[in-house]
């Protein structure tokens, strides 16, 4: 079975999150000679496969086998993969069974490595991600088997295969402000406290404001208002409360505490409540780390281009891996049809991704 055959097999599993649909058991059977550990919880399955070749660093490949629901608009059955004009059509081709197939095949064919190789797979990335990669990492920490470096095979490329790897990700701070007032009659504004009028005074100083200047890897952390509501949709009653929701995709330069201080600067003296939640923590892997060099060199050899180092996009399970002080980066196929009808990737990309991972395994322990 080659890497394309393997991908076609993985795509045939209807693994809509959090159901792995038997795909993890298949991968376990496919990687003979690797020690398998399952950590399952609340209907989520997580699989860790590992093999120690010799003393040396521990390199892990990570990903997810679950996919989002197919939805409407497909020209073919989304769970019966088909090949048309060099492209493979099915749910999960880009996000991210192509990546899983590529690293599973590369690891399977590895005969010699100066250290330990492993694979971490979950069926809970597209959902809440509560019982997925996080709990497997906790288990690995308990048995002292956390990797030194990790590649997450999420689709990272933008317009050409090999053009971008993720060396970090922005974080995400979600916030809700409730400004309290006193409801009243619109004809008697002096007898009420209209929260809209108060908040309207500070909105120009807050909406779309950058909380930092960014750097060579991260753009500025911007205060983005996502929802603003008050009142009862009538014209003669002023509201007693206003709710404002916002999001900050934060770089490593801005913390949750910085966001709190920013809000307080403009709401100081007002009667308000603030709720903040850091749903993802920003991280950056030093571009001088061995895993970054190994992947860069491998892409240059296979694709003939030098990838840019990016932190753009949303969040992924790499944030959990980085939290355990593991050097983590992400690389995969072009991401132009992820979560869309007729999701597809090219056979050429899949084969090149497999070659890149094979070369990365070689380069990683060569310094």
Swiss-Prot record:
The keyword Oxidoreductase does not apply. Binds 2 Zn(2+) or Co(2+) ions per subunit. GO terms for biological process: diaminopimelate biosynthetic process; L-arginine biosynthetic process; lysine biosynthetic process via diaminopimelate. It is an enzyme of class 3 (hydrolase). GO terms for molecular function: acetylornithine deacetylase activity; metal ion binding; succinyl-diaminopimelate desuccinylase activity. NCBIfam families: dapE_proteo (TIGR01246), PRK13009.1 (NF009557). Homodimer. Belongs to the peptidase M20A family. DapE subfamily. This is Succinyl-diaminopimelate desuccinylase. The gene is dapE.
